[in-house]
A protein has these predicted regions:
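Charged, glycine-enriched surface loops/patches
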Residues: 131-153, 170, 174-185
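Conserved SGNH/GDSL esterase-like catalytic core that processes O-acyl groups on lipids
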Residues: 30-136, 159-169
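Catalytic His-Asp segment of secreted/periplasmic serine-dependent ester chemistry enzymes
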Residues: 159-231
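Conserved small/polar residues in nucleotide/adenosyl-binding loops
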Residues: 1-5
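A generic structural signal for alpha->beta connector loops
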Residues: 57, 80-82, 147, 184-187
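Conserved catalytic region of serine esterases and O-acyltransferases that act on ester linkages
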Residues: 7-43, 181, 221-231
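Alpha/beta-hydrolase-fold catalytic nucleophile elbow
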Residues: 115, 153-154
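Active-site flanking residues adjacent to catalytic metal/cofactor-binding acidic residues
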Residues: 63-64, 153, 188
Length: 231
């Protein structure tokens, strides 16, 4: 484990035990970027997970937003012997790029399954800008993990973001077209089969995060694609 990771693990443990309520204590919170302020706690928890022996040398990682983070049965559903879930809630493609070096690179996975873009579009990002963010991320992945095979799961339609469906479709198409020219990346189309089946049925009380039926579809699509590259 990198020295920075070890320091972060110790800091996270300390922070969870000691809450600062003293008004005389000077905080560096204002020096932290909005991205770091929003996601730092979740990322530190992931670094603690990485520190555990049971999570070392995982061949496959899930990386991205709460679509992955909330997938509690991912390892069982996917039936992968070695799987590490590095999803963190509310994350954007931008924040994934920010934390990629800290929580994915040290694991050096054989395969990375990636889901992000949902929250970027929800915050008003255009399809073109999202495409550009993906290109920046893909470039960094290629530089830091050139031997990792990567899978981009298309942005899903949802009841909550139905007004953004056209942007989602355009963003998926743009990224898919780019991936066709990238030897390191593969595209997993989650969006089309959800639309074909009537995407509303893949959601229950929560209009943004999928139900069991949605994860059943996602796991099948991932297994089918990964099976093409099993060693």
């Amino acid at each position: 484990m990198y020295k920075r990771q070890e320091e972060a693990v110790e800091l996270a443990k300390s922070a969870s035990k000691n809450k600062i309520n003293n008004e005389n204590v000077v905080s560096n919170l204002n020096l932290v970027s909005p991205i770091e302020e929003e996601f730092e706690a979740d990322v530190r928890e992931l670094e603690i997970k990485l520190h555990s022996d049971q999570y070392k040398n995982n061949q496959i990682v899930l990386f991205g937003s709460s679509t992955f983070r909330d997938w509690e049965n991912a390892k069982t559903d996917l039936s992968f012997d070695s799987l590490l879930n590095l999803g963190f809630g509310g994350s954007t493609l931008v924040s994934c790029r920010t934390y990629f070096n800290r929580i994915v690179v040290p694991n050096n996975p054989d395969k990375m399954i990636f889901y992000a873009g949902d929250n970027d579009i929800g915050s008003g990002m255009s399809a073109e800008d999202l495409e550009n963010e993906f290109l920046l991320f893909a470039s960094e992945v290629n530089e830091k993990l050139p031997h990792t095979l990567c899978f981009f799961v298309s942005i899903k339609p949802s009841v909550f973001r139905n007004n953004y469906l056209n942007t989602i479709l355009e963003a998926n198409e743009r990224i898919k077209n780019k991936i066709e020219n990238f030897s390191q990346w593969r595209y997993i189309d989650l969006c089309s089969p959800m639309l074909d089946a009537g995407f509303e049925k893949f959601y229950s009380e929560d209009p943004l995060h999928m139900n069991v039926l949605g994860y059943s579809l996602l796991s099948k699509l991932i297994r089918d694609e990964i099976s093409k590259f099993t060693i």
